[in-house]
């Protein structure tokens, strides 16, 4: 269970407040205008930002004031943050130990995750020798080796072309099923949201303005679809 109770934060004079419940294994997309608070919400959950009020439960434990390292969360950003001088294997290994002192069991886990994301033949390469999609796979693998139950994605595939983006979404979909992960994914693309999540949050001015079926936004049956530039089918 991921539960936010009146989590507040002040961002550039915009007061934000989030109330949210997400069940284990649920996948939720987060959409909304630029600057509305989508990435801020993920950063609050990950512990990169400290709320000014409220309570937060992650995996049924109070993590309102815990550090990022203490939280049962992994987060993948738009920038893959791979170290150019390290091999793919070493970059992934950083998710297990910052000094890359891995046990035999950890090395086996790394190999297994690399195989899951299709990088088993690229482990000795440097990031510059990879395609954009492969670099994001490596960054995703670094998240997955941490074996945390909650995965946060902050527009990690927005810079990829449509074919690669769809490929990565399919990979995330399969990984979430296999590992029973709880997923929150920020996106500007409603089609991407529909591919990965049945439930969508629409963030507007620091609040959750819509919390419901993704399909209702796609087909315009939700009145709030107009926020995304979709003509609402609802007659007022």
UniProtKB/Swiss-Prot annotation:
Free-text function comment from the UniProt entry:
Part of the ABC transporter complex ThiBPQ involved in thiamine import. Responsible for energy coupling to the transport system.
Q: What is its EC number?
A: 7.6.2.15
Q: Where on the tree of life does the source sit, at the highest rank? A: Bacteria
Q: Where in the cell is it found?
A: Cell inner membrane
Identify the enzyme class: translocase
Q: Does the keyword section mention Mitochondrion? A: no
UniProt topology in membrane: Peripheral membrane protein
Species the sequence originates in: Yersinia pestis
Protein name per UniProt: Thiamine import ATP-binding protein ThiQ
Q: Which Gene3D superfamilies did the record assign?
A: P-loop containing nucleotide triphosphate hydrolases
Recorded hits in InterPro entries, A to Z, give:
AAA+_ATPase (IPR003593), ABC_SmlMolc_Importer (IPR050093), ABC_transporter-like_ATP-bd (IPR003439), ABC_transporter-like_CS (IPR017871), P-loop_NTPase (IPR027417), Thiamine_ABC_ThiQ (IPR005968)
Q: Which family does it belong to?
A: Belongs to the ABC transporter superfamily. Thiamine importer (TC 3.A.1.19.1) family.
Q: Which UniProt keywords apply?
A: ATP-binding, Cell inner membrane, Cell membrane, Membrane, Nucleotide-binding, Translocase, Transport
A single Gene Ontology CC term: plasma membrane
Tell me what reaction this enzyme catalyses. thiamine(out) + ATP + H2O = thiamine(in) + ADP + phosphate + H(+)
UniProt GO molecular function: ABC-type thiamine transporter activity; ATP binding; ATP hydrolysis activity
Positions annotated to bind ATP:
32-39
Q: Tell me which PANTHER family the record gives.
A: SPERMIDINE/PUTRESCINE IMPORT ATP-BINDING PROTEIN POTA, THIAMINE IMPORT ATP-BINDING PROTEIN THIQ
Q: Which residues are in the ABC transporter domain?
A: 2-230
């Amino acid at each position: 269970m991921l539960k936010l109770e009146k989590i507040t934060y002040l961002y550039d004079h915009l007061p934000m407040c989030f109330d949210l419940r997400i069940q284990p294994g649920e996948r939720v997309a987060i959409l909304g205008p630029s600057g509305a608070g989508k990435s801020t919400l993920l950063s609050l959950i990950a512990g990169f930002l400290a709320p000014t009020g409220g309570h937060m439960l992650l995996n049924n434990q109070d993590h309102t004031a815990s550090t990022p390292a203490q939280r049962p969360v992994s987060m993948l950003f738009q920038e893959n943050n791979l170290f150019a001088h390290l091999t793919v294997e070493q970059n992934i290994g950083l998710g297990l130990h910052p000094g890359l002192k891995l046990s035999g069991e950890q090395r086996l886990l790394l190999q297994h995750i690399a195989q899951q994301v299709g990088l088993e033949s690229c482990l000795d390469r440097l990031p510059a020798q990879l395609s954009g999609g492969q670099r994001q796979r490596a960054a995703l693998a670094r998240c997955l080796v941490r074996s945390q139950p909650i995965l946060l994605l902050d527009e990690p595939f927005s810079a990829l072309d449509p074919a690669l983006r769809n490929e990565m979404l399919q990979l995330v979909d399969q990984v979430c099923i296999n590992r029973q992960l709880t997923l929150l994914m920020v996106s500007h693309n409603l089609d991407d949201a529909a591919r990965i999540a049945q439930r969508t949050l629409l963030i507007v001015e620091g609040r959750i303005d819509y919390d419901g079926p993704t399909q209702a936004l796609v087909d315009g049956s939700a009145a709030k679809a107009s926020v995304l530039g979709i003509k609402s089918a609802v007659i007022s």
